Amino acid sequence: MRWLMRKCIRCGRYTLNHDRCPYCGGELIVPHPPRFSPEDKYVAYRLEMKIKTGILDLNKIPVYDP
């Protein structure tokens, strides 16, 4: 599926352009999250990359404050 909307990472505005933001000239990204599938075959690779880059720390105990 081809996404039409883009979001500027500099000013946060949405646009239909695909190259640069017409307001500030910033870089554009696709603001839509990837589709979810319970049969995702790449989840192990994503988890490994998050651990290696430090985004996910498995040694840290999560604190839940109800």
Curated annotation (Swiss-Prot):
<dbReference type="Pfam" id="PF04135">
    <property type="entry name" value="Nop10p"/>
</dbReference>
<comment type="similarity">
    <text>Belongs to the NOP10 family.</text>
</comment>
<protein>
    <recommendedName>
        <fullName>Ribosome biogenesis protein Nop10</fullName>
    </recommendedName>
</protein>
<keyword id="KW-0690">Ribosome biogenesis</keyword>
<dbReference type="GO" id="GO:0030515">
    <property type="term" value="F:snoRNA binding"/>
</dbReference>
<dbReference type="GO" id="GO:1990904">
    <property type="term" value="C:ribonucleoprotein complex"/>
</dbReference>
<dbReference type="GO" id="GO:0006364">
    <property type="term" value="P:rRNA processing"/>
</dbReference>
<dbReference type="InterPro" id="IPR023532">
    <property type="entry name" value="Nop10_arc-typ"/>
</dbReference>
<dbReference type="GO" id="GO:0001522">
    <property type="term" value="P:pseudouridine synthesis"/>
</dbReference>
<comment type="function">
    <text>Involved in ribosome biogenesis; more specifically in 18S rRNA pseudouridylation and in cleavage of pre-rRNA.</text>
</comment>
<keyword id="KW-0687">Ribonucleoprotein</keyword>
<dbReference type="InterPro" id="IPR036756">
    <property type="entry name" value="H/ACA_rnp_Nop10_sf"/>
</dbReference>
<dbReference type="InterPro" id="IPR007264">
    <property type="entry name" value="H/ACA_rnp_Nop10"/>
</dbReference>
<keyword id="KW-0698">rRNA processing</keyword>
